Amino acid sequence: MNKKYLRDLMNNDLSPLIKDTGIEFYDVEYSNNNGKNILTFYIEKDDGLISIDDCELINNKISDKLDEIDPISDPYYLEIASVDITTPFTRDKDFKKNLGNVVIVNLYQKLDSKKEFKGILTDFNDTEISLELEKKEIKIERSNISSIKLSLFD
């Protein structure tokens, strides 16, 4: 399933349905777990406290629209999940929030013969990020980042 298509669906078709809730979509993911197709929407609130009632509310608000659009031809389970410390980030506001923190960056293509880096996120712009490694700083093109998330251990 095309990630861009799912993000466009989330941003253009589903976000307006939850606008009045104080809850925002963070990201969307389509996966297969033990033969079960799962469409997961990650949600967040400014205060960071997502309850089971919030998940149920969002599920109820978007289910009918998903049935109408029918974005996935195969049967799937709809899952609404909260963002946590292990959730990869992609938005500028997430990069800004994590400046100065230790992050783990996974790449599509190797850079300096490595596909994973762990370092301090020191800067970012529309096209690249800067990481401070042990003795040097490197720049990584954002288009080459498959995932970036906060490191649980420094």
From Swiss-Prot:
Q: Name one GO cellular component term.
A: cytosol
Kindly report the protein's main subcellular placement as a broad class.
cytoplasm
Localization in the cell: Cytoplasm
Keyword annotations from UniProtKB, A to Z? Cytoplasm, Ribosome biogenesis
Q: Which GO terms describe its biological process?
A: ribosomal small subunit assembly; translation
| Family note | Belongs to the RimP family.
**What is its biological role?**
Required for maturation of 30S ribosomal subunits.
Specify the protein name.
Ribosome maturation factor RimP
Q: Which species is this UniProt entry from?
A: Finegoldia magna (strain ATCC 29328 / DSM 20472 / WAL 2508)
- Give the encoding gene's name: rimP
